[in-house]
């Protein structure tokens, strides 16, 4: 009887240790979940000059970004057109796909041409504030960006809870501050207020990084010189 009870105790101990080991593996897998592949959904608001405000209804209000490794792809769709921007951080590659019912163009941008396409920030100072709020489920810290020339200020919110590769919407911002969850950037004659609505980690469709057949290749200069009606 003694030997039988001792055998049972040892077996129970082994079962307990096995269960603890499996639980630890599960917790480690959750804690160290990869963040190099997934998607982000952004909400976009526009500030246009009075003479152009009538066009705001044609602009995309949502951007979906997929990221994997060194690559990102940003997709913005309106009622009549879609713009897809593919980037690769390692090679400084950027490709823009323009698609509508009447045209399909592909434009490759070198590093020097990219600023005009993705927008810029003027020379500015960045000051961290004490404000903290939750955006898309992540704790974000507030920063005030002040234009050195005009004195105009805008705010941006960054989180360090996660680490995500910059994409065409965020690459003008200082990545050392964290992942931007809400910010304003200037693009040509308009300003874009961008806010993250959702972040998801997991496999992304491989096809989103490819260029469909049938797109006509243009240079950035050819695109700029193209009449609007085309």
Predicted regions and their residues:
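Bacterial Sec-dependent N-terminal signal peptides
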Residues: 1-40
């Amino acid at each position: 009887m003694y030997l039988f009870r001792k055998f049972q105790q040892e077996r129970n101990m082994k079962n307990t240790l096995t269960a603890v080991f499996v639980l630890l593996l599960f917790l480690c897998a959750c804690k160290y979940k990869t963040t190099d592949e997934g998607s982000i959904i952004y909400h976009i608001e526009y500030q246009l000059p009075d003479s152009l405000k009538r066009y705001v209804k044609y602009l995309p209000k949502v951007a979906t970004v997929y990221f994997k490794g060194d690559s990102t792809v940003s997709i913005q769709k309106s009622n009549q057109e879609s713009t897809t921007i593919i980037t690769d951080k390692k090679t400084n590659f950027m490709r823009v796909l323009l698609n509508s019912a009447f045209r399909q163009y592909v434009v490759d941008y070198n590093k020097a041409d990219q600023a005009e396409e993705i927008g810029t920030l003027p020379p500015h100072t960045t000051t961290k504030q004490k404000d903290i709020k939750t955006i898309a489920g992540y704790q974000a810290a507030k920063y005030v960006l002040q234009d050195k020339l005009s004195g105009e200020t805008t705010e941006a919110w960054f989180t360090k809870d996660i680490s995500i590769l910059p994409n065409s919407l965020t690459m003008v911002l200082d990545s050392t501050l964290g992942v931007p969850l809400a910010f304003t950037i200037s693009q040509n004659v308009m300003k874009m207020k961008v806010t993250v609505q959702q972040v998801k980690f997991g496999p992304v469709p491989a096809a989103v990084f490819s260029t469909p057949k049938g797109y006509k290749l243009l240079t950035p200069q050819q695109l700029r010189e193209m009449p609007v009606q085309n």
